[in-house]
Amino acid sequence: MSSRILVTGGSGFIGSALVKALVRGGHKVRVLDDNSRGAPRRLTDVEKDIEFIAGDIRDASAVANAVRGMDEVHHLAYVNGTEFFYTQPDLVLDVGVKGMVNVIDACRAANVRKLILASSSEVYQTPPKVPTDETAPLIVPDATNPRYSYGGGKIISELMALNYGRKHFDRVLIFRPHNVYGPDMGFEHVIPQFVVRLKRLAAQHPSGRLPFEIQGDGSQTRSFCHVDDLVRGVLVMRQKGEHLGIYHVGTTEEVSIGEVARRIAAHAGRDIEFKPRPAPAGGTERRCPDIT
């Protein structure tokens, strides 16, 4: 059955992939994005099949206009990228919290009673158990560390979605993606950053092992999920998920950050020598979802 769906942050990395999948599924899709972080080129393949509204998620009137006439809202608009967490935590929280308030208010005003929220594995910070299931505590270990602006904002968003959802929505679903990667993901994340750095080092050092700086000793692990797999998981959740349900979307293969660097270097036929440097406060040693 075709639905009218608003995707906020729809020109972003994950948002655009979701938009394309929804269009392929026969849905009528509207996108709200100010393209401050997203890129219109990501939607070129479907630009004739969607309605695009240029607007800031913090602008209540823009959000209200975008929500009006929809059957459901998929809220993905946010500021991602570790550098922003440390350098612009006020922006991260402004977009995250105001955006969530505006989406809920607009849905209530327009009687849109279906909401899907993109959360994050960052809500766990350092989880007490790995693999981590969806019932693990959500914490902000140090409110003075700007690193937690992102995870803290996501926790607030989840609390709002769940508690408003009990009274004002028929269906609220939350997904927590884990370290998503794929084409055109931008340069704010570990895989593309490593590619750029290794390319530069290879040009500077035509032979021999590449001196590669890494936070700590590179033993920190993550479970990376391709964006296409993430979208498939979100669509399954949309179809089968329970009201007020929270779902991990990811894989269970843990890979060390050092191994990520080694694999990228190997594609260029090079070896690397790690140069450890201090990791910023607030990092997580292990992150892997329980997806059972």
Please give the residue ranges for each predicted region.
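N-terminal Rossmann-like NAD(P)+-binding domain of SDR-like oxidoreductases, especially those catalyzing
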Residues: 1-180
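Residue-level signal for the nucleotide or nucleotide-sugar donor/cofactor binding architecture
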Residues: 38, 58, 87, 95-98, ...
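A short, amphipathic alpha-helix embedded in the catalytic core of nucleotide-handling enzymes
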Residues: 103, 164, 193-198, 233-237
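Hydrophobic alpha-helix immediately C-terminal to the catalytic Tyr-X-X-X-Lys motif of short-chain
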Residues: 156, 160, 164, 193-194, ...
